[in-house]
Amino acid sequence: MEGGFGSDFGGSGSGKLDPGLIMEQVKVQIAVANAQELLQRMTDKCFRKCIGKPGGSLDNSEQKCIAMCMDRYMDAWNTVSRAYNSRLQRERANM
């Protein structure tokens, strides 16, 4: 068994680590973790808002509430994300 990160990081097989490849893999892992956290938060908030008495199935009003809640949550998240990215770009341009 090899080290904790496996052999994917070497790239050329020479045993040297490729910093660019490592950065890309870290970025992918961060993006996946962020998506999982977003989904978990959205699920928790919408469940608490829409499901009064958990049962074997969702009634029609609960289904509509969940769908609308998730749509609003994603819209809000996208709006905040765009504003944040725009601000980061402006700040980078001013450096």
Curated annotation (Swiss-Prot):
The modification N-acetylmethionine is found at residue 1. GO terms for molecular function: zinc ion binding. Pfam families: zf-Tim10_DDP. The modification Phosphoserine is found at residue 7. It is a peripheral membrane protein. InterPro entries: Tim10-like, Tim10-like_dom_sf. GO terms for cellular component: fibrillar center; mitochondrial inner membrane; mitochondrial intermembrane space; mitochondrial intermembrane space protein transporter complex; mitochondrion. Disulfide bonds join 46-69, 50-65. A motif (Twin CX3C motif) lies at residues 46-69. It is found in: Mitochondrion inner membrane. Transmembrane segments: none annotated. Keywords: Acetylation, Chaperone, Disulfide bond, Membrane, Metal-binding, Mitochondrion, Mitochondrion inner membrane, Phosphoprotein, Protein transport, Translocation, Transport, Zinc. Its main location: mitochondrion. The keyword Metal-binding applies. The modification N6-succinyllysine is found at residue 53. Gene3D superfamilies: Mitochondrial import inner membrane translocase subunit tim13 like domains. GO terms for biological process: protein insertion into mitochondrial inner membrane; protein targeting to mitochondrion; sensory perception of sound. Ubiquitous, with highest expression in heart, kidney, liver and skeletal muscle. Mitochondrial intermembrane chaperone that participates in the import and insertion of some multi-pass transmembrane proteins into the mitochondrial inner membrane. Also required for the transfer of beta-barrel precursors from the TOM complex to the sorting and assembly machinery (SAM complex) of the outer membrane. Acts as a chaperone-like protein that protects the hydrophobic precursors from aggregation and guide them through the mitochondrial intermembrane space. Belongs to the small Tim family. The twin CX3C motif contains 4 conserved Cys residues that form 2 disulfide bonds in the mitochondrial intermembrane space. However, during the transit of TIMM13 from cytoplasm into mitochondrion, the Cys residues probably coordinate zinc, thereby preventing folding and allowing its transfer across mitochondrial outer membrane. Heterohexamer; composed of 3 copies of TIMM8 (TIMM8A or TIMM8B) and 3 copies of TIMM13, named soluble 70 kDa complex. Associates with the TIM22 complex, whose core is composed of TIMM22. This is Mitochondrial import inner membrane translocase subunit Tim13. The gene is TIMM13.
